[in-house]
Every structure is written in structure tokens, then in C-alpha cells.
Amino acid sequence: MSSKFIKPGRLVILLNGKYAGRKAVVIKTFDDATASKSRPYGHCLVAGIDKYPRSIVRSMSRKTILKRTAIRSFVKVVNYNHIMPTRYNFEGRDESAFTGLKNTVTVESSQVAKRAHTRLAVKKIFEAKHKAGKSKWFFSKLRF
């Protein structure tokens, strides 16, 4: 698959592996020419949602609302063949959240030793965006 459609900020759906069916944001792309020996194929760095926030109603307690709106995130390097690009982007006109995400998630921070800290930072960015009511499609579970 060409990286013509897969650009940073594009929302994608993962097709294979542990996070199959989960939505993610492309942070950085690596084409065949720039690939290292360990990954001699087109791939990209993505940050996505492992556990989606659930719906809430006004009558729920504050504690229940906090528990139900919690998001679990993941950071992963994925082959282009294992993702499906969507028509959506992470940001519309406001680029601040994606810039924060791009600064937080780097190739070095996606390594196993630093991944836990990176996941927490991504979780905070996603929760802030969810609380603001942006990208409703991204924060809803994919039904299949």
C-alpha cells in the first residue's frame, strides 16, 4: 500500500494483531526507501485507543462517570498492509492536539522501555480531546 493516503494525522483502523479493529492516529510514516534493516517495508508509527470511553447519563455519580470515561491507549509500529486509512483526520482546523501528540510520541519513545510513559501521555491527550467533545467518531467503538 502506498503512503499516498497515509499521512500524519490520518485516522486508521488496525486490521491485524492484538489491536485489530481499533482506531489509531498515524504519527509518522516510513516508506520503503527510508526503512531500516529491521523493517525493510513501508510502516508507520501509530497511537490509538485500546479501551474506548463508554456512554454516560446525567444521573450517574462522579466516580462512575470518571470510570466510564477512562481511555486506555497504545503506541505501535505497524506495517502499511495491516491498516486501513479512513476519510477522517485527527484534527480539523485546530492543530494543537496533534502537535502535542506528535511531540509526545516519537520512534524512541515507542521502544519497550519508554512505552509505558508514552502511553500515559497519549492517554491524557486523548482524554482531553474526548472531554472537549471533538472527533466523536474516533472515540466511539467500531461495531463489527
Swiss-Prot record:
A GO term, aspect molecular function: structural constituent of ribosome
Q: Which residues cross the membrane?
A: none
Q: Does the keyword Ribosomal protein apply?
A: yes
Q: Which UniProt keywords apply?
A: Ribonucleoprotein, Ribosomal protein
Q: Which Gene3D superfamilies match?
A: 2.30.30.770
Cellular component aspect of the GO annotation: cytosolic large ribosomal subunit
Residue ranges annotated for the KOW domain, each copy included: 6-43
InterPro entries, from UniProt?
A: KOW (IPR005824), Ribosomal_eL27 (IPR001141), Ribosomal_eL27_CS (IPR018262), Ribosomal_eL27_KOW (IPR041991), Ribosomal_eL27_sf (IPR038655), Translation_prot_SH3-like_sf (IPR008991)
Report the SS bond pairs. Answer: none
| Alphabetical GO biological process terms | translation
Similarity section: Belongs to the eukaryotic ribosomal protein eL27 family.
The protein, known as = Large ribosomal subunit protein eL27
Record lineage: Eukaryota, Amoebozoa, Evosea, Eumycetozoa, Dictyostelia
Q: Which gene encodes it?
A: rpl27
